[in-house]
Amino acid sequence: MEFECQERLEAANDQRSESGLLNTDLRIGNDGSVEIPNVKLCCQKKKGTLVPSGSKQLLSDKDLSTTIIDLPQALISEILNCLDPKELGLVSCVSTYLHRLASEHHAWKEFYRERWGLPVVFGAASSGLSDERSWKDLFVEREFRSRTFLGRYSIDTLYGHTEAVRTVFLLASAKLVFTSGYDSIVRMWDMEEGLSIAASKPLGCTIRALAADTKLLVAGGTDGFIHCWKSLDGLRNLFDLTGFQKEKTEFRLWGHEGPITSLALDMTSIFSGSWDMSVRIWDRSSMKCVKTLRHSDWVWGLAPHETTLASTSGSDVYIWDVSSETPLAIIPDAHEGTTYSLARSHTGDFLFTGGEDGGIKMFEIRRYGSETSVVLISQWMPHTSPVYSLSFEFPWLVSASGDGKLALIDVRKLLKTNRCAYSKRISSSTVEPPQRMLHGFGSNLFSVDVGYDRIVCGGEEGTVRIWNFTQALEIERRTRALKGMRHENRMRRRRMQMEMNAKNGRPDQCSIAAHKNPINGERNRAWHSKRRASGKAKA
């Protein structure tokens, strides 16, 4: 791989100090621009050549033979900040100096956060995470892992529920799966082994929503209550669902006047949506309802992000400002019929909806000062029945439908980041992202969740299935290892051949071949010559 600059930045080392172009003199503005005081650069006739405008002495060709690595480190860092992950990886292959700058650049943390949020590490492994592994290593591993959803998989089927499963939740950081449904029992499963860990007592009504983090587990019932479990320090599986522990960790929140259909958590709040046409926001410290967002129809789904919250009510989608309890934007009739499901990217800028018409839509939330607008980006029709559930983990959007199928949609090409302008831009490509359909259910699928290399779903059959893609992950790792070994062997043979040629005084045969057949237009002319000799080329 090689790094190509469209406009080569050249400056003389001996002029840089005289002109004041030093690391300590650089100032980075609020808009991301770099201010270079006391120096004005003008462009000479030679393309890409930058010369101080006040300089009286012309620079010689020898002085102008510098490269980008001769720029101040702060300026190079700002240039690297304008690159995407692929480009930043290419830069790290140019030289040892650029490899160090690119590998340690702070942009890798931002790349990771934009796609998956900051990592939540559970257990003893959380100590020393930043010291042991760089953000680049974490990003590369997560990006590599996300590609395995197109590979082989195995299916674990979990039995235990006696009736339909209405909701599933995957807590990947603790390797736990929570499920519940018409039998009113919340069950906890081991994600790795697929074994039942614990089950709660019957809660008295259908459980239609679950949400959890490492501190709190909440379940929403059709009787309008939120049943909560606090985690216990030192307990391997976090939550005491059975009530065997001496410490009391269970309690209920009351306030809704109808069945609870959706739940979500953040660091400070609990969000609950209900058929009473409201979304309630509960403070996690006092466990009191602090805000209520009123809708015009039943609430089916919600997705909070920082100070905003997206919700579906009837066929409409709302974007709320939580602090003022007012809607920033409304998408009327997002789907034909009810809009059942909702998912959101970690940046909060992209929204995914699924509806009764079997369609899935992707919207971008754009903010211009105090104004907020929502723009349709793309849409798909992968299902023949209503889309009851959506789950998103970059770059995969996973949907569960009444037709008994799961659809995997890669939205990578639709999420392009222009870091230099600190804004989002949407790819103009009209080609739909690749899809993968997962079959195996003969009836309705009501809920799905995705995390790392697992997809968990539940439906009318009363079973829970875990689609395990670790097999594809191991195959891909072995393939990469073999490719690396082959490349290393080729390079070793190449070096040995060069050493032998140098000892014998013979020219390098590969260099001669490259000189005779350069990788440029010469190859095209040879191809056209063959084409003229053999007549018209076939289409």
From Swiss-Prot:
Residue ranges of the region described as Disordered: 505-539
Domain of life assignment: Eukaryota
Boundaries of every F-box domain copy: 65-111
InterPro entries xrefs: F-box-like_dom_sf (IPR036047), F-box_dom (IPR001810), G-protein_beta_WD-40_rep (IPR020472), WD40/YVTN_repeat-like_dom_sf (IPR015943), WD40_repeat_CS (IPR019775), WD40_repeat_dom_sf (IPR036322), WD40_rpt (IPR001680)
SUPFAM superfamilies per record: F-box domain, WD40 repeat-like
Compositional bias ranges of the Basic residues kind: 526-539
GO biological processes: cellular response to phosphate starvation
Keyword Repeat annotated: yes
Cellular component annotations (GO), alphabetically ordered: cytoplasm; nucleus
Ranges for the WD repeats: 160-199, 201-239, 255-292, 294-330, 334-373, 382-419, 433-477
Entry keyword set: Repeat, WD repeat
Pfam family name, one: F-box-like
Family matches, as SMART domains: FBOX, WD40
Residues in coiled coil: none
Protein name: F-box/WD-40 repeat-containing protein At5g21040
Species the sequence originates in: Arabidopsis thaliana (Mouse-ear cress)
High-level lineage: Eukaryota, Viridiplantae, Streptophyta, Embryophyta, Tracheophyta
